[in-house]
Amino acid sequence: GGEIFGKVVEKGRHGKLYTLTIRDYGVFVVTKDVYEKVKVGDEVML
């Protein structure tokens, strides 16, 4: 972890799969904990 740093532009949930779309990097699958903690517009490090 730690190599991806950017702004969350979208959140998605597909069944039990949780995703965050990070500007300039694309879509990442994350845990439910991360998904619920992060808001659109937040800067995150993955």
Per-region residue spans from a language model:
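Hydrophobic beta-strand residues in large extracellular and virion-surface proteins
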Residues: V8, L20-I22, G41-V44
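Structural detector for short beta-strands of small beta-barrel domains
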Residues: G1-H14
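Generic hydrophobic-segment detector
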Residues: F5, T31-K32
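Short, structured beta-strand/loop micro-motifs enriched in basic residues and often containing a Trp
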Residues: I22-V30
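Generic "edge-of-domain/loop-turn" microfeature
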Residues: R13, V27, Y35-K37
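Short aromatic-glycine-enriched beta-strand elements
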Residues: R13-T21
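Short nucleic-acid-contacting surface segments enriched for D/E, G, S/T with interspersed K/R
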Residues: D33-L46
